[in-house]
Structure formats: C-alpha cells, structure tokens
Amino acid sequence: MLPFEKAQPVYVGARAIGVGNAFTAIADDATACFWNPAGLIQCQGVRIFGMNKFFGRSEYGFDPKGISYSYRQTSFAWGNKIALGTRSQDPDYSYYAVARQFGSYLAFGGSLKFQRRHPSRYYQVFGYNPSFDLAVLVKLSPNWKIGLLWQNEDLRLGIDRQTIGLAYQITLKRPNSDLVVSLDLEQDHSINGKSNTKARMGFELPVSRFLQLRGGNSDGSWTTGVGLKCQFSSIIARVDYAWIGDTRTYRSHFISSEIAF
C-alpha cells in the first residue's frame, strides 16, 4: 500500500469521484486546487468547499476542504486534505495554488504542497516535505478541453507523475442538459524505474438546472454520484454525493458541498 499522498487519484470532491475521478480537464470548481490548478481560472469570485467520508470510516476517513478566489485572469486557492486511519499515520497536506489565464483558451497553474504534522498544538502555515504540481488547461474548441498535470513528490528535480485529461461537452436538445464525458490517463514512475498507466473515465448529465447525475470507472473501481445545485440571488450552493467501490467492502460514501459568491 502506497503512502496516502502518493496513492492516486486524490479523491477530493464528491463530484470528481462521481465521474470516476476523471477530473483533470473539467476542474471547474474549487477542488481544481488539487486536480488541476490551472482550472481555478474557471471559478470566478469566491468558492468555499468541504467534504466528508460519512460511511465506511472504519477503513479510512478523508475530510478535505479549501477556498479559492478568482478575479479576471488570476486565481488563488488554499486547500487541505487529511486522511484518518491509514497506514501512513494520518497524513495531513496543505496546498497553495495560483493560476493565470492567457488569452481566451489557455491557462497555467501550479501548487506548492506541504505535509503537516498531525496532531499538532499549533497551526502550521507550511510544514515539511515540500513538493509541487504544474498544470495547463487548454480550451481546444467550444466543446473540447484538455488538461495536463505534472506532479512532484519531494521537490527534487524531476516529475514523478503526469496526467492528461480530455473533456467533451455534448449539447442535447433539452435545455440545461449538456452531457460532459471525460477521460484521464495517468502515468507514474515506480521505484524500480518502471512506468504504470491508469485510466479513469466518467460522465456528468444534468437532468435539470438543479439536478446532475454522474457515473464512471476509476482504474477498475466503479463510481456513481448525484449533485444538487441551487442559486439564491448571487450565491450558488451545491451539494454532491458519490460512491466508489474502492475497498473490499464497497462502503466508501462521500458527501461534499460548495458555496460560490
């Protein structure tokens, strides 16, 4: 079993899990801080999110959270993810991300990641074991997006993992019903120098302006999810649920919420 931070995908956000963790090219909410920081540019204004694994915590717990702020062509974000009950002694990581848009079709982003000591008697702004992510998001056409992510795990020169993501939006006849299908291909490098490739795929189908259905497969583990979105004046609230069959007992259920204003 890999240390939790090296085990991929990152499992942040019930919406991303619902589409099979194929989120590198979508990355259009505050969880982009973890999946593809370049995607933060799609989240104008302030967004706050939190997530909880509310069932099956006897196997492991996972409770990420974060906030993003975007104004015009620049975005900033902070995120934290902490796992409980794992073999790697409750790993706790903080992300600090920035993104910048260039033109109408291209954005670059990056994240600095720090491991935090847990438990701790004081707040740790940074921590230890720094590493980084580099990311690109390209809008190839009104319907196609491509996301690229390079991940480093110990701040040495070199990339330990790279991911390419594709997302395609299919316009259906019904209003508010654009189907999005996505695919992620991830390649990592093991200690013995060999490369491992993983595939993740999924879809998101808006049934109405309030309800979205999701499904996918994350490197052999099936996923499903549902989302509810409401708007109150200039405030948008969303609640998402996801299930993934990633353990022997198939009990990994997640719920997350996001507020945008």
Segments predicted by a language model, with ranges:
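Subset of outer-membrane beta-barrel
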Residues: L2-F261
